[in-house]
Amino acid sequence: MTGAPPLVIVNPVAGGGRARRFWQQSAIACREADMKVDVVQTERRGDAANLAADAGDRLVISVGGDGTAHEVINGLLRRPAGRVPRFGALMYGTGSDLVRTLPSPRRPKDVPSWLEKDRWRRIDVGRLGSSTGRRYFVNAADVGIGAEIVRRAAVGPLVLGGTINFLGAAVVSLMVHRNSSVRIRADDGFVEEARVRTIAIANGSHLGAGMRIAPDARPDDGLFDVVIIGDFGRFEAIRHLPRLYQGTHVSLKKVRVLRARRLEVDATDPVGIETDGEPAGATPAVFEVVPAALDVLVW
C-alpha cells in the first residue's frame, strides 16, 4: 500500500478480549512482513469515531465488533467532503455480522496479505434521522424488537459466543415484547399502516449474530432491502425463529420485502431503533441510502 500507513483502531474489550488478542497476533505478522501500521486502542465509547474523524485520507481499520465498526464509519463520514473514505474491518466482536457481507481475514497470518493486495469494494451506507439526531450505518438497522434484543445481548455472558448470546436474547425478547402499530412510507409511493414485530432496513444481509434477515441484500445496489415482519404472536414468532437464520422467513405470509432508497417510519407510541447493533433512539425516523459512500478493503 502507498501513502500514509493504515490507522488501526482496536477495541480491546470487544468480544470479551478476542479482538485485542487477534490484533496482538496480527501485529506480529505485520512486523514480520515489514508492513508499517499505526495502532491505537480505544478507552471509552466515542473514541473510535473521534480517531477516525481525525485520521485524514488514509485507510482506517476497525478491530472489534459491529459496534466498533459503526463508530469508525460514523467518524469517517463526518469528515469534510472530499475523497471517499477508506475502511477495513477485522471482526472479532459479539455479533460480527458485517464480515458475512464484506469478508476479511480470520487468521492473523493473513492480515499482511490482505493489506498488500489492496482490493476494494465501493459500497453504500445508510443514514438515519431519529430522536437522537443523525447517524450512519453500514450493515442494517431495525425498528422494533431488534432494539430490545440488542439491549439484552449487550449484558449477556460473552463466554457463550455471539450467536448463542443473541439467540437467547431473541427468545426472551419475543416473550415480553409487544408488537407495534406503525406507518411506513417508501419512496416508490408504498404506504402501509400495520402492526409489526419488527422492520429491518438492510444494506447487508445479516444481523443479530447470524440472522440472515435480508438474503438478497447487496451493499452496492443503491437500495435498502426492507423486511417487514408482521403481527406474529409470541409462540408463532419463536417457532419461526430458525427460519431467520436460514433466510427462509421471507416466504412467510406475514413477512413482506420491498426495496427503497428512502423509508419513513412513524408509530402510535415511540418504537426503539438499533443500527449495526447499537441503540439509536426511537421513531419517528427517516432512513436514506447514501450511495457509493465508502471504499471497503475486502479479502
Where are these regions (language model features)?
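Short Gly/Thr/Asp-enriched flexible loops that form oxyanion-binding sites at enzyme active sites
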Residues: T68-P80
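ATP/nucleoside-binding phosphotransfer catalytic cores, i.e., glycine-rich phosphate-binding loops
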Residues: A186-D188, E193, R218-P219, I228-W299
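Glycine-rich phosphate/pyrophosphate-binding beta-alpha loops
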Residues: D142, G146, A200-P215, P279
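Glycine-rich beta-strand-to-loop/alpha-helix junction loops that act as flexible
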Residues: P12, V63-G65, L90-Y92, N203
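Short beta->alpha linker loops
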Residues: E43-G46, G64-G67, G93, G144, ...
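Gly/Ser/Thr-rich active-site loops/lids in small-molecule metabolic enzymes
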Residues: P157-N165, L207-A209, P215-E236
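Catalytic core of DAGKc-family lipid kinases
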Residues: V10, Q24, A33, V40-T42, ...
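ATP/NTP phosphate-donor binding region
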Residues: M1-V63, K109
